[in-house]
Amino acid sequence: MTSDNQKDAIINAVNTASDAWKSAFNTGDAAGCACQYEDNAVMRADPFGTFTGIEEIQAFWQNLINDGFSDVEYVQPSIEVIDASSAVLKSGWKMNKAHGVIHKELWVIQDDGTAKLREDHFEAQG
């Protein structure tokens, strides 16, 4: 069982990492986006495909940034703590040229107490 203090720490770590990802994207820093993922993370970006590992994930975000996408915001995000070392974030999202839904961001607490994405499944709907 996860204590309230553990849950708060996990939620804080996820919020900090998620904010860092959004800030990196909005400033055109694809490497900053990619460093929020674990080395072997899997990102499923519907309808674009599945990307595995930091290199593929960074290339995906760099492509979007190069195409002029920016200003990402999460709409009504929710975070559910799964266990003592992970949580799932779900949310709507919007940016200047697209919008959609985050079906599952699996954030895992690292040895240093920070959170990184192990799984990222989102969908562009327009």
Residue ranges and their predicted role:
Residues T2-G32, V42-G126:
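A beta-strand edge to alpha-helix "cap/lid" segment located at domain peripheries
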